[in-house]
Amino acid sequence: MDRIIEKLDHGWWVVSHEQKLWLPKGELPYGEAANFDLVGQRALQIGEWQGEPVWLVQLQRRHDMGSVRQVIDLDVGLFQLAGRGVQLAEFYRSHKYCGYCGHEMYPSKTEWAMLCSHCRERYYPQIAPCIIVAIRRDDSILLAQHTRHRNGVHTVLAGFVEVGETLEQAVAREVMEESGIKVKNLRYVTSQPWPFPQSLMTAFMAEYDSGEIVIDPKELLEANWYRYDDLPLLPPPGTVARRLIEDTVAMCRAEYE
C-alpha cells in the first residue's frame, strides 16, 4: 500500500513514468527523500536491497528521465527491483479504467493488482514469457545479429512464447523460423525478468540437430556458427544472453583444450 513520503524516509528511489526511470547523474537515487525533493509525493515499497527499502514513485521529472537499460550494470538484485518498479508504474498508469465496464479502478491493498470499483474485476501486471537459447554444434555456437541490434552485437536466438504453446515448442519454432535449423537435447538453464517492456526470459541450451542456416530477414541481419575462441561483439555482462554464451564457451573449452 502506498503512502505519503516523509522527510526522513530513505532508501532506493525508483521514480518512473511511461517506462522511463529518473537517473540523476546517471544513477539510481539513494538516500533521504528530502535530498531528491520527493517529500509529499506518494510511494510504494516494492522490496528491499541490502537491508534498505526500495520505493516506487510514479512521477515524471523534467530532466534525467532515461531507460532502465542504463542501470543494467547494477547488482542483479537491484537491477531487477528497478525493473519491477518500471513495470509496476506502467501497469498502474495503464489500468486506471476497467477494460470490461469502463469504470474507475483502484489499487489493491494486499497485492500488486488493480480492482474495478463497479464490476469487481481484478487485473494483475502482464508478464510476457520468452525463450532464449544457445545452440551448440561441436566447437561452435550459433550467433545472430538482430535487426533491432544494428550496433554489431551478435547474440543467441530468442522469441515470445505463443498462446497454447509449451516452452519447448516455442524454442523449436523460434529457432526454425529465424534460422531454418532443428535442435535437440534441450536443457533448461535459468530465467531472468527483463523489463523491456515486461518479459520473463527462460533460458535454454540446445545442440544442433539438422538443417542449413536460412535466416528470416524480418528478424535477423545475419547468423553464423562461431568457434568458441573467435567470437564477435557480444551482449553486455549481466544479461542472460551473455551467460548462455559464456556457459557454452566454458563447455567447449573443457572439451577442446
UniProtKB/Swiss-Prot annotation:
Substrate binds at residues 25, 69, 111, 124, 192-199, 241. Keywords: Hydrolase, Magnesium, Manganese, Metal-binding, NAD, Zinc. Divalent metal cations. Mg(2+) or Mn(2+). Binds 1 zinc ion per subunit. Coiled coil: none annotated. A divalent metal cation 2 binds at residue 174. Belongs to the Nudix hydrolase family. NudC subfamily. This is NAD-capped RNA hydrolase NudC. The gene is nudC.
